[in-house]
């Protein structure tokens, strides 16, 4: 086809007129220095606090320090290829992570990238990792239980949906075991679990994932892992990422449980970042805002009202309240709960479960110190049957501890004191429990009933646990209807109490334990 010169010029003119030249206006800066994952940048005049920055090689960073003539940023991931003079661009975006049901059953890093070798996550939505907690008006009081399946917790330190309950203790005294048991016990209870591992060995995280898979708990669990080999930035961000994933379910009228294991390591990572950014150190070299670091995270765990859920989902979900329950873990040094981070988190949470090394070494596991462990709001959420039966246990243990300390110095004890000591020994034995074997509500109720009504008093201490197990097995085989009634009503009626008493007495007479 031949075109004459005039047609060619017309064609070029029309193409030029139809051209839409779009310019990508972005602020640029230059890297001044790179040290230990911290970058100083000159020339980023309109950057926001917490904004994502784009570095060469598809690497991103987070702007944390905004100073007069430079910006201090932390790099997310590898930083070996970044050097002085590199160009940095603003993105105009706050850090976001993928959220949604697609993450359930997966192991991801602090940015939501899969690290379990099972392919991409394919989440349809993302959400900001830093969000403001729901206001007072949108919250509901805690009234539904989270059953951990651990006798001493469900009986004496009950946890409710939307509560923040701290698990605190020295290293190697069973903190993670308590948290994992709580996850395993949520099978079939319509509760999504999120386990955030911060600063742990990769092998330890793998063991937890393997155990969750073996027990079928990965079907409703998300694992967010920032191991000890990951950068301080990843360890600092992991809890916020996990919290955002949990909020997805809370805001849509579902229930979620999140475990931060542990926040001491997150505080260490934040201290490291802050000192490298040259922020002024305070007590124990932590920065001044380390309280806010944890308070803004834990305040996001809440039970939200039906109105909040309806407003959030634009009317799609009606009449359902959502909750996010948090179990933060704190590691103490030589039992010192008066250190900076432990006191901070104790004051933020709604109660704490103290685990003691001495109890652990004495074979009392879980090593829960009932005297100083409290649940400030969980009592309202406790199931009727457990609430009815657990009061006596706490009293028995408190009296036993007081008398045990006194009895060391007294040679001759009166009959009443001796009885209380014997009862206390048996209750302490009863509250022992093997790992990965959480109990159902009826099993806990039966154990508490037997202890309260003196059925353990004439047993040898070593016979207590075999008796309890034998009794549970006997009820399963011979009294399934009674078990079903207790499970369905979560209460113990007069008739059921009579049937239970008769069942325990006949089992005890049989001596099959």
From Swiss-Prot:
ATP binds at residues 169-176. One of its GO terms (cellular component) is plasma membrane. It catalyses: ATP + H2O + 4 H(+)(in) = ADP + phosphate + 5 H(+)(out). GO terms for molecular function: ADP binding; ATP binding; proton-transporting ATP synthase activity, rotational mechanism. CDD domains: ATP-synt_F1_alpha_C, ATP-synt_F1_alpha_N, F1-ATPase_alpha_CD. Keywords: ATP synthesis, ATP-binding, Cell inner membrane, Cell membrane, CF(1), Hydrogen ion transport, Ion transport, Membrane, Nucleotide-binding, Translocase, Transport. InterPro entries: ATP_synth_asu-like_sf (IPR023366), ATP_synth_asu_C (IPR000793), ATP_synth_asu_C_sf (IPR038376), ATP_synth_F1_a_nt-bd_dom (IPR033732), ATP_synth_F1_asu (IPR005294), ATPase_a/bsu_AS (IPR020003), ATPase_F1/V1/A1_a/bsu_N (IPR004100), ATPase_F1/V1/A1_a/bsu_N_sf (IPR036121). It is found in: Cell inner membrane. The record marks 373 as: Required for activity. Its main location: membrane. Its EC number is 7.1.2.2. It is a peripheral membrane protein. Belongs to the ATPase alpha/beta chains family. Produces ATP from ADP in the presence of a proton gradient across the membrane. The alpha chain is a regulatory subunit. F-type ATPases have 2 components, CF(1) - the catalytic core - and CF(0) - the membrane proton channel. CF(1) has five subunits: alpha(3), beta(3), gamma(1), delta(1), epsilon(1). CF(0) has three main subunits: a(1), b(2) and c(9-12). The alpha and beta chains form an alternating ring which encloses part of the gamma chain. CF(1) is attached to CF(0) by a central stalk formed by the gamma and epsilon chains, while a peripheral stalk is formed by the delta and b chains. This is ATP synthase subunit alpha. It comes from Burkholderia ambifaria (strain MC40-6). The lineage of its organism: Bacteria, Pseudomonadati, Pseudomonadota, Betaproteobacteria, Burkholderiales. The gene is atpA.
């Amino acid at each position: 086809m031949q075109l004459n010169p005039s047609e060619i010029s017309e064609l070029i003119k029309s193409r030029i007129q139809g051209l839409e030249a779009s310019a990508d206006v972005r602020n640029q800066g230059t890297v001044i220095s790179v040290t230990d994952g911290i970058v100083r940048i000159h020339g980023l005049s309109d950057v926001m606090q917490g904004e994502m920055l784009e570095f060469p090689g598809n690497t991103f960073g987070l702007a944390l320090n905004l100073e007069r003539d430079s910006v201090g940023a932390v790099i997310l991931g590898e930083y070996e290829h970044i050097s002085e003079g590199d160009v940095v661009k603003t993105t105009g975006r706050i850090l976001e992570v993928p959220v949604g049901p697609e993450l359930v059953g997966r192991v991801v890093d602090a940015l939501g990238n899969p690290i379990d070798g099972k392919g991409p996550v394919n989440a349809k939505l993302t959400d900001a990792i830093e969000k403001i907690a729901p206001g007072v008006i949108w919250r509901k009081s805690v009234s539904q239980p989270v059953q951990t399946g651990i006798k001493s917790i469900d009986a004496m330190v009950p946890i409710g949906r939307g509560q923040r309950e701290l698990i605190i203790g020295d290293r190697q005294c069973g903190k993670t075991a308590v948290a994992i048991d709580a996850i395993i016990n949520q099978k079939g209870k319509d509760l999504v679990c999120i386990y955030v591992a911060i600063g742990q060995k990769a092998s330890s995280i793998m063991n937890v994932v393997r155990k969750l898979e073996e027990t079928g708990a990965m079907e409703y669990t998300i694992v967010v892992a920032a191991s000890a080999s990951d950068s301080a930035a990843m360890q600092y961000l992991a809890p916020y990422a996990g919290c955002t994933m949990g909020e997805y379910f809370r805001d849509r009228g579902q229930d979620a449980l999140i475990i931060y294991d542990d926040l001491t390591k997150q505080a260490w990572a934040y201290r490291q970042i802050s000192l490298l950014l040259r922020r002024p150190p305070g007590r124990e070299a932590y920065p001044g805002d380390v309280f806010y670091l944890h308070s803004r995270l834990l305040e996001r765990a809440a039970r939200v009202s039906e109105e909040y859920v309806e407003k959030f989902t634009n009317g799609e979900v009606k009449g359902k309240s959502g909750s996010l329950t948090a179990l933060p873990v704190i590691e103490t040094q030589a039992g010192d709960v008066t250190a900076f981070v432990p006191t901070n988190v104790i004051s933020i949470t709604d109660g704490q479960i103290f685990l003691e090394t001495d109890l652990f070494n004495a074979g009392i596991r879980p090593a829960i110190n009932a005297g100083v462990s409290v649940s400030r709001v969980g009592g309202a959420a406790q199931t009727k049957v457990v609430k009815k039966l657990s009061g006596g246990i706490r009293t028995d243990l408190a009296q036993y501890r007081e008398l045990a300390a006194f009895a060391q110095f007294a040679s001759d004890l009166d009959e009443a004191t001796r009885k209380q000591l014997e009862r206390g020994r048996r209750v302490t034995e009863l509250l022992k429990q093997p790992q990965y074997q959480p109990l159902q509500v009826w099993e806990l109720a039966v154990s508490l009933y037997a202890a309260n009504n003196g059925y353990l008093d004439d047993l040898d201490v070593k016979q207590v646990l075999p008796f309890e197990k034998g009794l549970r097995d006997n009820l399963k085989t011979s009294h399934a209807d009674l078990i079903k009634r207790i499970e369905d009503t979560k209460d113990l009626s007069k008739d059921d109490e009579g049937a239970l008493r008769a069942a325990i007495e006949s089992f005890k007479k049989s001596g099959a334990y």
